Swiss-Prot record:
It is found in: Cytoplasm. Mg(2+) 1 binds at D13, D15, D208. One of its GO terms (biological process) is GDP-mannose biosynthetic process. NCBIfam families: HAD-SF-IIB. Alpha-D-mannose 1-phosphate binds at R22, R124, R135, R142, S180, D182. The active site is at D13, D15. Its cofactor is Mg(2+). This is Phosphomannomutase. The gene is PMM. GO terms for cellular component: cytosol. The lineage of its organism: Eukaryota, Viridiplantae, Streptophyta, Embryophyta, Tracheophyta. It comes from the Eukaryota. Catalyzes the interconversion of mannose-6-phosphate to mannose-1-phosphate, the precursor for the synthesis of GDP-mannose. GDP-mannose is an essential sugar nucleotide for the synthesis of D-mannose-containing cell wall polysaccharides (galactomannans and glucomannans), glycolipids, glycoproteins and the antioxidant L-ascorbate. Can complement the yeast temperature-sensitive mutant sec53-6. Overexpression of PMM increases total leaf ascorbate content. Silencing of PMM decreases significantly total leaf ascorbate content.
Length: 252
């Protein structure tokens, strides 16, 4: 077995990189990652919380990889142990949070859109997820809202109002998925996890949403990483085989 190269880590996005979007990881990918860990240190970084990442990558995710960063690294595990947490509540404080949430709920209440359901704001430890239609809608309703939003720009308009109103809080607004957008302090994107990787001088990051506006963009562009854009889990395996295992995995 080849020895691990010191100072080198391969860091992976989850959705669209290690798994198909919102799907569970395949046994083949788990086996490949196990092989990869023999030659390089391996970490995963996802925007979702640990519960959702565990649903996709398995319950032993914090020990299957050397590093596991959930919520972009706001919750950080190394070798299965929790090494750091940061929360929106402690960062902003309850008064500012309440001001933002109250304004947002009033805005949604006055919004004239075809349907509304429930759970308009989901409070996560590192971000707020805001959905004008409400996260309790069905898949069919999601699809309909996405089409409606493309025409009427509901989310885009809402974000520009909130950005102006709460400019003093230095928040980042990231529109993603079909029905919602995320709100978090500036710098709390995936580059946040890099503070835990000071010992590595070569950080290879693999992600699918590396374009401007995508949630892999900042870490892909960071001067601390070597960025790789992938198109699917199969492409991830192919690129890693060539990069780290010295073989072409295209003909399997």
């Amino acid at each position: 077995m080849a020895a691990r190269k010191p100072g080198l880590i391969a860091l992976f996005d989850v959705d669209g990189t290690l798994t198909a979007p919102r799907k569970e990881v395949t046994p083949e990918m788990l086996k490949f990652m196990k092989e990869l860990r023999k030659v390089v240190t391996v970490g995963v970084v996802g925007g979702s919380d640990l519960v959702k990442i565990s649903e996709q990558l398995g319950k032993t995710v914090t020990t299957d990889y050397d590093y596991c960063f959930s919520e972009n690294g706001l919750v950080a595990h190394k070798d299965g142990k929790l090494i750091g947490t940061q929360s929106l509540k402690s960062f902003l404080g309850d008064e500012k949070l309440k001001e933002f949430i109250n304004f947002t709920l009033h805005y949604i209440a006055d919004l004239d859109i075809p349907i509304k359901r429930g759970t308009f704001i989901e409070f996560r430890s590192g971000m707020l997820n805001v959905s004008p239609i409400g996260r309790d809608c069905s898949q069919e309703e999601r699809d309909e809202f996405e089409k409606y939003d493309k025409v009427h720009k509901i989310r885009q308009t809402m974000v520009s109002v909130l950005r102006e109103k709460f400019a003093h809080l230095n928040l980042t607004f990231s529109i993603g998925g079909q029905i919602s957008f995320d709100v978090f302090p500036q710098g709390w994107d995936k580059t946040y996890c890099l503070r835990y990787l000071e010992e590595f001088n070569e950080i290879h990051f693999f992600g699918d949403k590396t374009y401007k506006g995508g949630n892999d963009h900042e870490i892909y562009e960071s001067e601390r990483t070597v960025g790789h854009t992938v198109t699917s889990p199969e492409d991830t395996v192919k690129q890693c085989s060539e990069q780290f295992l010295g073989k072409d995995n295209g003909s399997s």
